[in-house]
Amino acid sequence: MALYEHVVITRPDISPAQVESFIEEMTTFLKEKGATVGKTEYWGLRSLAYPIKKQRKGHYSLINIDGPADAIHELERRQRIAEDVMRYMTVRVETLSDEPSPVLSRKERRRD
């Protein structure tokens, strides 16, 4: 099976709890399709580089996936028709890291 990093941007008007619930739904779906879900990260409400669907902010989330391409295609199909999803991107990678992503670690450094 291949390794993927999947980043999704959801609408800013939903709560972080709803975003976590949405990520759980995606995780459950992927497990049903035979994929293994590694690390999931919620990066928070962040400003977008340019407006998407008349929105200037969005909730960013990352999911590491080890699974078949069929599961990824179906996940992307579902996100294309989901109203809460503004953008998504899936990238195939050579290895998955268990360490916090650079985006999340930079966010933690700012708090200190």
UniProtKB/Swiss-Prot annotation:
Q: Which InterPro entries match?
A: Ribosomal_bS6, Ribosomal_bS6_sf, Ribosomal_S6_plastid/chlpt, Transl_elong_EF1B/ribsomal_bS6
PANTHER family recorded for this chain?
A: MITOCHONDRIAL 28S RIBOSOMAL PROTEIN S6, SMALL RIBOSOMAL SUBUNIT PROTEIN BS6M
Give the encoding gene's name.
Answer: rpsF
Task: Identify the CDD domains for this entry.
Answer: bS6 (cd00473)
Descriptive protein name: Small ribosomal subunit protein bS6
Q: GO molecular function: any one?
A: small ribosomal subunit rRNA binding
Cystine pairs annotated here are none
Q: Which NCBIfam families match?
A: S6
